[in-house]
């Protein structure tokens, strides 16, 4: 057993470092079911906090549905809240970098659905849902007025 050492408050070396705290593990949120597939949003600290939609198919295979270069996150709720929707195998998501909505299907590149706002990142989307096979969303617009 190690010998106990009494030290003044704040003067001892802690085995818990900042690197240990921020390293963290993966986070999982926004679980969705589409047919036999299960989807979730996976936060990845090792990828600068990037969030990716992952699909688990009926055969147990897990696969990223969003390619590198995209971060599924919205500026409306910042860290979550209806940032993607899935229906009939098609995923609709908000991308952090430009706050635009994209559509992606299995083995395809994401296709942008919304235009460029007048102000960079000025339009923000959240609470994505699918109704009658169409993606609907809440739009929060940030504009300059004079």
Predicted regions and their residues:
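Multi-bladed beta-propeller domains
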Residues: 2-27, 57-80, 104-124
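Single conserved hydrophobic/aromatic residue that forms the stacking wall/gate
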Residues: 134, 138-146
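Residue position within the beta-strands of beta-propeller blades
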Residues: 38-42, 92-94, 135-137
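Structural motif
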Residues: 46-54, 98-103
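Short loop/turn segments that connect beta-strands within the blades of beta-propeller domains
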Residues: 34, 49, 87-88, 96-97, ...
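Hydrophobic alpha-helical hairpins/lids featuring a short glycine-rich hinge
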Residues: 91-96, 116-128
């Amino acid at each position: 057993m190690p010998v106990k050492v009494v030290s003044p408050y704040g003067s001892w070396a802690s085995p818990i470092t900042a690197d240990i705290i921020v390293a963290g593990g993966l986070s999982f949120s926004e679980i969705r079911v589409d047919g036999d597939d299960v989807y979730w949003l996976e936060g990845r600290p090792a990828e600068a906090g990037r969030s990716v939609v992952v699909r688990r198919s009926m055969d147990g295979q897990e696969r990223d549905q969003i390619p590198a270069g995209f971060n599924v996150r919205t500026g409306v709720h910042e860290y979550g809240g209806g940032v993607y929707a899935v229906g009939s195998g098609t995923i609709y998501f908000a991308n952090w970098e430009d706050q635009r909505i994209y559509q992606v299907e299995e083995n395809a590149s994401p296709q942008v659905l919304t235009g460029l706002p007048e102000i960079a990142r000025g339009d923000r989307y959240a609470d994505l849902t699918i109704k009658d096979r169409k993606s609907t969303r809440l739009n929060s617009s940030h504009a300059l007025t004079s």
